[in-house]
């Protein structure tokens, strides 16, 4: 499934956030850009929470977002935090989550450190899992 964005524009009064945005996105995809580039606004448009000033968006199904602030339980490990949102007993996901964290270069920290001791980048990667 693709999301097709054509001639998208978003203005807030006189401030132009983006204009003439043409983009085709194949799932799964990650939206990554520096602060202030309109990522959150674009996601809000895709989720139907914010109308565009002009342009069209087609093919939007389910949209997920990872926000800039993590919402981790500080006393749990990264693996325990990731398992909180999954249905069923957390133990059934342990091996799969360990593999996910290993792919992110966090295999040791994900099991050993409480979230309060993770770096900012490790916390954001935990939120992605």
Please state what every model-predicted region is.
Residues 3, 16-20:
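Conserved structural motif at the start of ABC-family nucleotide-binding domains
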Residues 34, 63, 67-71, 76:
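ABC ATPase nucleotide-binding domain signature
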Residues 47:
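Helix-to-loop junction immediately C-terminal to a conserved catalytic motif
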Residues 54-64:
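Conserved ABC transporter NBD signature motif
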Residues 76-88:
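Q-loop/switch helix immediately C-terminal to the Walker
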Residues 93-109:
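Conserved ABC ATPase "signature" region
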Residues 114-118, 122:
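Conserved ABC ATPase signature
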Residues 126-129:
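ABC ATPase nucleotide-binding domain "signature" region
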